[in-house]
């Protein structure tokens, strides 16, 4: 940054989910072994994560037989095992069909709602990003624009990169979780 101050929480735990991994078909590794290898964990945490991600039925399967959607869920579970403060997702819905993408983004929303966690997601799925995030940061060799999805869709730099048609086609809506803000005053979707 050119100005300001960057503050980092002491002992910040980061969970990282890559967009994919190369699985060697001849290497026998179960889902449970993959999730827990090189991770300090307890059985309760493991059981909670596989339940939350809905992969209990996969734990004894070999990685090599998983579908694309199953593998994405396994990668997500692995990134959540140590209860991170920050979850970094690199193209988490890549190679999923549209229903798989919607299901996966819904799961990410549920994780965000249930956990005290920040999520940084890299994605090229503009439509899904614009409807499922609170803040968008648009990069093209520099920060082109950032803000709430509604603001970004109307930003001149966004429009110059993607065109007016794309900005007008964006199905942008704002979802606000009112249940967690009972004691504060909610005005125009923001706590004031």
What are these regions (language model features)?
Residues 83:
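Conserved catalytic motifs of ABC-family nucleotide-binding domains
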Residues 154, 161-192:
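ABC ATPase nucleotide-binding domains
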Residues 87-91:
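Catalytic Walker B motif of ABC-type/P-loop ATPase nucleotide-binding domains
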Residues 43-60:
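Conserved ABC ATPase "signature" region
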Residues 123-124:
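H-loop/switch region of ABC-family ATPase nucleotide-binding domains
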């Amino acid at each position: 940054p050119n100005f300001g101050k960057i503050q980092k929480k002491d002992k910040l735990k980061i969970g990282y989910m890559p967009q994919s991994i190369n699985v060697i078909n001849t290497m026998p590794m179960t889902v449970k072994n993959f999730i827990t290898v090189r991770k300090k964990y307890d059985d309760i945490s493991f059981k909670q994560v596989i339940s939350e991600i809905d992969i209990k039925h996969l734990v004894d399967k070999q990685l090599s037989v998983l579908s694309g959607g199953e593998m994405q869920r396994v990668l997500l579970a692995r990134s959540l095992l140590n209860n991170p403060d920050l979850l970094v997702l690199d193209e988490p819905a890549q190679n999923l069909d549209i229903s798989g993408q919607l299901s996966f983004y819904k799961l990410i929303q549920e994780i965000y709602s249930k956990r005290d966690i920040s999520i940084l997601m890299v994605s090229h799925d503009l439509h899904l990003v614009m409807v499922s995030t609170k803040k968008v940061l648009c990069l093209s060799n520099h920060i082109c624009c950032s803000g709430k999805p509604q603001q970004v869709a109307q930003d001149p730099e966004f429009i110059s990169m993607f065109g007016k048609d794309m900005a007008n086609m964006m199905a942008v809506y704002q979802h606000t979780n009112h249940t967690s803000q009972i004691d504060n005053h909610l005005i125009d979707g923001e706590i004031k």
